[in-house]
UniProtKB/Swiss-Prot annotation:
Residues 10-131 form the MaoC-like domain. InterPro entries: FAS1-like_DH_region, HadA-like, HotDog_dom_sf. It comes from Mycobacterium leprae (strain TN). This is UPF0336 protein ML2425. Belongs to the UPF0336 family.
Length: 166
């Protein structure tokens, strides 16, 4: 396994997403339905309050919504040689410092921790340190993505744009 030529010098690079991600009540509910998480704190503010929270509680994997956008941005900004139209998550880890709640504004500081290539496959590890408006840690997300080495593909840019718009 080797570091792709295009990725040399990128390891350890930092990217701060320009805007925050606003956690919305309805997005929490929609996501909880999608992942079939029926815990009442995701749907009912009274249930969340009774459980000790001031707002709806996001499911543990809710961060994936904002994380996907950040990952696409970092692959584009750093020109990582991976075909993002044909990539999947190999692994994802979260370290929570507090619960994500409705109305949170989340800020992402993202780092490219590693990129390796072997036999036409690229493995990239991306870490995001997520903070709130006060700069306090909310969660650390570490995602390992696996995909084919980027090649010129006539439809790749259209596919990436479609994925980014979701």
């Amino acid at each position: 396994m080797t570091v792709p030529l295009e990725a040399e010098g990128l390891i350890g690079k930092h990217y701060r997403q320009l805007d925050h991600f606003q956690v919305g009540r309805e997005k929490i509910r929609e996501f909880a339905i999608a992942v079939k998480d029926d815990h009442p704190t995701h749907y009912n503010e009274t249930a969340a309050f009774e459980a000790g929270y001031p707002a709806l509680v996001a499911p543990l994997t809710f961060l994936a919504i904002a994380g996907r956008r950040v990952q696409l941005e970092i692959f584009t900004k750093f020109n990582i040689p991976i075909n993002v139209a044909r990539v999947f998550h190999r692994d994802q880890k979260f370290r929570f410092y507090r619960t994500i709640l409705a109305q949170d504004k989340l800020y992402f500081d993202t780092y490219l921790d590693s990129v390796i290539e072997s036999h036409g496959t690229v493995i990239a590890e991306v870490r995001s340190e997520v903070t709130d408006t006060e700069g306090k840690a909310v969660v650390t997300s570490i995602v390992t993505m696996l995909g084919e080495l980027a090649r010129q593909d006539a439809t790749a840019e259209e596919t990436v744009a479609a994925i980014a718009s979701i």
